[in-house]
């Protein structure tokens, strides 16, 4: 029979006979799920939009969204296509960022194609306090802007993704990125550039591979599970010949309920970052701070060649509530962090610590809200956020 829009799938490794398939397209694959008739595997699409609202001293108020469109067709791994769009605006700096990530199933047998892109405005900001484990914080006298760095970032990253049946994921790809730092007067970064003679604009090409394994009983508030990851990569400057470095970032986290009903959970995370070679920019250093490691400090508070931290939380589910939109659970948690960075030619035995806690809301494992207050030698740090995940 004729049918220009008809696809015929069958096993590549088996003997097949096809008759009268004029106009149809033939695709042979050994993928079991594709070749097996599954009447309950329907073609459908889902759309999800989650607002992101938050606050921390570095960003001020944050408003944004995370939108995901997923299509389930004949060939799924675990879906046929998925497009994710995200955007955020930061009121303290008037900066914004835009992101896109698309995934397309079975580009090569069980491998998916991922396309990712990111853009930040010229006044999007990160922090920089210098290189070293004992850098000083002058917020009390010079205010927070002194260590803010305005940086524009453009990134495009195509990758291949393989997923295992039990929660494993392997991604490998290349990246092209361009970054421009504004040498703002009366800020620490301007002094750093003048002292070190650094270039404020750079473009990089990179290759990386990342392995992740996740096995959690719940996505937003896990009571039992483990997550592990390993990222290995290499980046080279397109402008400065010989400027290149490699990096290794391992991580491991556990969630374990301490009572049978899962209301009391112990959670811990370990993460390290190793830069191999010395030819990296300050924004490529191994950094720890409020959003990655030490919740009582400012973002990117300490930067070095190597970093390590551990977070440990004790979480308690106080009460379950029924609302007109989603069933929600209210909980409280306390946490302790420790970590440090290492830099060549620095003799430091100091380990930084922070401690605190807060409240969280979990809405049907779809959306969470968090309010936290952590303390450190730099003083207290308050933050809250609404989004997905703990």
Q: Which residue ranges define each predicted feature?
A:
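Outer-membrane beta-barrel initiation region
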Residues: 2-114, 121, 198-223, 306, ...
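Flexible, solvent-exposed coil segments and beta strand-coil junctions
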Residues: 41-47, 75-83, 133-142, 184-195, ...
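Transmembrane beta-barrel strands of outer-membrane/channel proteins
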Residues: 51-55, 83-89, 102, 113-131, ...
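Strand-connecting loop/turn motifs
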Residues: 60, 108-112, 165-167, 225, ...
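Sequence/structural signature of outer-membrane beta-barrel proteins
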Residues: 70-74, 86-92, 120-124, 179-181, ...
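A subset of solvent-exposed loop/turn segments in beta-rich extracellular surface proteins, enriched
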Residues: 71-96, 104-154, 174-190
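C-terminal outer-membrane beta-barrel translocator/porin domains of Gram-negative envelope proteins
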Residues: 99-102, 128-129, 140-146, 193-200, ...
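Outer-membrane beta-barrel "beta-signal"
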Residues: 208, 361, 379-390
